[in-house]
Amino acid sequence: MRKKRLLSRISFSSLFLLCGTVLSAYTGIQADLRNLIKETTKKDIDVYKAIKTTEGKKNIITSLKKSYEVNPKDTTKLLLDAWKQSFEKGELGIPDLDFEDVIYPKTSEPFKFERKVDHFQMTYQSFKDLSIEAKLSYNFNWFGDYSLGGFTAKKGDKHYFDLFLKIKSNSDPKKQFTTEKFLTKEEKNKVNGKEITRNLEWIEFSASLSWLIKGKDDVSQKSVKQFLSSYANNTSGYSRDINLFIYLEYLIK
């Protein structure tokens, strides 16, 4: 009986410590954001409440824009710390890394994948020289048969990949990070003949992305060449706008 109680106590203590660690990381960004805005704009915003509403998000972004004008160093650190923490927790914020359009872009896909961030290293002095190197691992679990060209997969097959990712600041002078990248606007689109208004809250960072995918075994490497051939070797890099605000949302909400 004593042993059972002891185990329960240890389990509870471990859970408490784990929750405390996660909570402190989340409240750390929340507190840092609130303090930064207060120091640079003299506004005391309850960011936890504000980030849940459209007007609140706009207020935070407008305040961060002012913060970047007054204190670019600490504002840069806050935004990139949020990116790093979110990425390491699996919130990548880059649709290209979700394999959304690899196969069956308009119907259900015959596989599910598990993804894990194995390594993430970020170096920078400012947004101009930001450099990220990351390694992601993917496990593809096929729940249906699939055939395309020379590639076939059977229900129950598993494929394992490593993705080596590099992200750098866009070298185009017109794409450099400035206060103009703190965006709050409305976008109007027509859907089924009806005009729909979307509120967009963006802190836009223009990056250059490149990656290389390798199979972890011979079967997986073969599937890379056949199934992911147009996707696997993006070594030359291409431009992608990344919304830094979503990382703050993820950590604070």
UniProtKB/Swiss-Prot annotation:
InterPro entries referenced in this protein's UniProt entry, alphabetically: Lipoprotein_3 (IPR001595)
Organism domain of life: Bacteria
Family matches, as Pfam families: Lipoprotein_3 (PF00938)
Membership in a protein family: Belongs to the MG439/MG440 family.
Protein's UniProt name: Uncharacterized protein MPN_505
Upper lineage: Bacteria, Bacillati, Mycoplasmatota, Mycoplasmoidales, Mycoplasmoidaceae
